[in-house]
Amino acid sequence: MARLREFYKETVVPELVKQFGYKSVMEVPRIEKITLNMGVGEAVADKKVMEHAVSDLERIAGQRPVVTVARKSIAGFKIRDNYPVGCKVTLRRDQMFEFLDRLITIALPRVRDFRGVSGKSFDGRGNYNMGVREQIIFPEIEYDKIDALRGLNITITTTAKTDEEAKALLSLFKFPFKG
């Protein structure tokens, strides 16, 4: 069992019950899934770029990503319908907790001039979004073997009803919020 999953059951759940006064432990918010998304607009011109992005995301997530395609043609971006424009991977259960552990303890502290992540990036329904500018903050990516620096979006989907509950949940996981 993942270290953070045990931590959630033993520490986070009782703390949230005490903080918000839930009647049942089943009411306590939990992290449902983590989605990693990498937009690769340059893949329109060069197919190799998409292969590199997929392999980078696979190393980061430990799971094969799905290539996402354009839903409609946009002449200004030289994109046609069904062109590959990015890749994404959805993590659940143990892989999700392992990734979250690596993100909090290893990857985020490796960001240059890191002062914490924004506490305002919640969507109003208890989900958190953040962007990572460079994929090299993850230890799985070797700096010498990458073709270009690429960013990615990380979406943490929770069962929390409000942003306040979601922030309390992530804070108890030692998520490094600013201030």
Curated annotation (Swiss-Prot):
The UniProt record lists the keyword Cell membrane: no
NCBIfam families attached to this UniProt entry: PRK00010.1
Protein name, entry field: Large ribosomal subunit protein uL5
Keywords (A to Z) from UniProt: Ribonucleoprotein, Ribosomal protein, RNA-binding, rRNA-binding, tRNA-binding
Similarity comment: Belongs to the universal ribosomal protein uL5 family.
Gene that produces this protein: rplE
Signal peptide: none
PANTHER family according to UniProt: 60S RIBOSOMAL PROTEIN L11-RELATED (PTHR11994)
GO biological process: translation
Function: This is one of the proteins that bind and probably mediate the attachment of the 5S RNA into the large ribosomal subunit, where it forms part of the central protuberance. In the 70S ribosome it contacts protein S13 of the 30S subunit (bridge B1b), connecting the 2 subunits; this bridge is implicated in subunit movement. Contacts the P site tRNA; the 5S rRNA and some of its associated proteins might help stabilize positioning of ribosome-bound tRNAs.
HAMAP family given in the database record: Ribosomal_uL5_B
Organism the protein comes from: Neisseria gonorrhoeae (strain ATCC 700825 / FA 1090)
Subunit structure: Part of the 50S ribosomal subunit; part of the 5S rRNA/L5/L18/L25 subcomplex. Contacts the 5S rRNA and the P site tRNA. Forms a bridge to the 30S subunit in the 70S ribosome.
Annotated Gene Ontology cellular component terms: ribonucleoprotein complex; ribosome
GO molecular function annotations of the record: rRNA binding; structural constituent of ribosome; tRNA binding
Tagged with keyword Ribosomal protein: yes
Pfam families: Ribosomal_L5, Ribosomal_L5_C
